[in-house]
């Protein structure tokens, strides 16, 4: 639902000039992210993005509600990448700096696919960890070091128990579809995961 906008222009393959009325630039996002969105014709934020991105950029905890297709992924993904970019700390093996927790593998894959171009353009790394996917590639990526971890609760608990990942460096914890995670009975796992995340970090729901 993230690579959509209320105003789209034809996709560009050459240099991108950000228009003065670009809505994402007006929100205060880093130029590289704004340019990458503009390259795909994404120039005008959806209401949920307008409402949540400024508070998220200011470091506040944010609760956003929206249906599929409302632009929630960009609403939390853009300010999270902006924060990590401003922080500038290097990657540390097994210690991601931001976490997106989602209820299902399918949703995790959607979030990963949506954020991949943005993660790439700011020179960061991300990894999806979920059941039904290779342990070997997931653990290998964590050992090399990533900035953003997208995970389902069960697989993340498993990797925590194996010592393959640590959450002590998480600056932003995002619960995507938190209501669905509760309905699916994941609250004990989510509680345990958040207990491993340092206090004082940012929470986006």
Question: Could you describe each region identified by the protein language model?
Answer:
Residues 1-21:
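Intrinsically disordered, low-complexity accessory regions that flank the conserved helicase/ATPase core
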Residues 15-66, 176:
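Conserved pre-motif I regulatory segment
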Residues 29, 76, 86-89, 113, ...:
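Short, conserved catalytic or interaction motifs in soluble domains
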Residues 32-35, 39-42, 91-161, 169-172:
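Conserved nucleic-acid-binding Ia/Ib motif block in the N-terminal RecA-like helicase ATPase lobe
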Residues 50-62, 73-92, 106-109, 113-118, ...:
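Walker A/P-loop NTP-binding motif
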Residues 58-64, 96-98, 146-147, 201-202:
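Pre-Walker A (Motif I) flank of P-loop NTPase domains
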Residues 69-71:
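Conserved glycine(s) of the Walker
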Residues 153-205:
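SF2 helicase catalytic motif II
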């Amino acid at each position: 639902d993230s690579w959509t906008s209320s105003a789209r222009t034809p996709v560009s393959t050459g240099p991108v000039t950000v228009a003065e009325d670009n809505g994402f630039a007006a929100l205060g996002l880093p130029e590289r992210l704004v340019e990458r969105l503009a390259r795909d014709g994404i120039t005008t934020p959806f209401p949920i993005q307008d409402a949540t991105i400024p508070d998220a950029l200011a470091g506040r905890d944010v609760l956003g509600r929206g249906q599929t297709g409302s632009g929630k992924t960009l609403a939390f993904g853009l300010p999270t990448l902006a924060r990590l970019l401003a922080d500038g700390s290097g990657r540390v093996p097994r210690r991601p700096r931001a976490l997106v927790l989602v209820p299902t593998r399918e949703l995790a894959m959607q979030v990963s696919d949506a954020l991949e171009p943005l993660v790439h353009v700011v020179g960061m790394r991300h990894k999806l960890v979920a059941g039904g996917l290779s342990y070997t590639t997931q653990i290998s990526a964590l050992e090399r070091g990533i900035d953003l971890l997208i995970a389902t609760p069960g697989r993340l608990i498993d990797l925590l128990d194996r010592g393959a990942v640590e959450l002590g460096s998480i600056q932003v914890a995002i619960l995507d579809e938190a209501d669905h995670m509760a309905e699916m009975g994941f609250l004990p796992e989510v509680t345990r995961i958040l207990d491993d995340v340092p206090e004082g970090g940012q929470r986006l729901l």
